[in-house]
UniProtKB/Swiss-Prot annotation:
Protein name: Putative pre-16S rRNA nuclease
Source organism, top-level taxon: Bacteria
One of the record's GO cellular component terms: cytosol
Enzyme class: hydrolase
Main location per the UniProt record: cytoplasm
Enzyme Commission number: 3.1.-.-
Cited SUPFAM superfamilies: Ribonuclease H-like (SSF53098)
Entry keywords, A to Z: Cytoplasm, Hydrolase, Nuclease, Ribosome biogenesis
Compartments reported by the entry: Cytoplasm
Biological function: Could be a nuclease involved in processing of the 5'-end of pre-16S rRNA.
GO biological process: rRNA 5'-end processing
Amino acid sequence: MILAFDYGTQKIGVASGNELLGTATPLKALPCKNTQPNWDDIAALLKEWEPEALVVGLPLNMDGSDSESTVRARKFANRLHGRFGKKVWLIDERLSTREARERTGIKKADSRVDSMAAVIIAEGFFAGDAKVF
């Protein structure tokens, strides 16, 4: 069991993933306050789901370079590891939001898109595209 996160400064999409089946399910999008995650909400998810590992999407630029969002996502991953002691994997999530919009048919900002992006991040992890943090 893993939890995958699509980190954003307004919302964090979350999905659960089953490694044996290679499937993921969207859970929810957690709201952020002043660009900061609500750590109590994240702690509650970890307690409920008891994941073996966490996967965070890394929003790289199209040329593979880091952006301001990449730096924030790495910081989020670092804090997840520091606070909860879980193994955290990073995965290139370029175009995951675009694919999530295509899958859901939702074009505007919507929490369902964020949690579907987390599903895509989990699927990438199952495909072997992740790097350990």
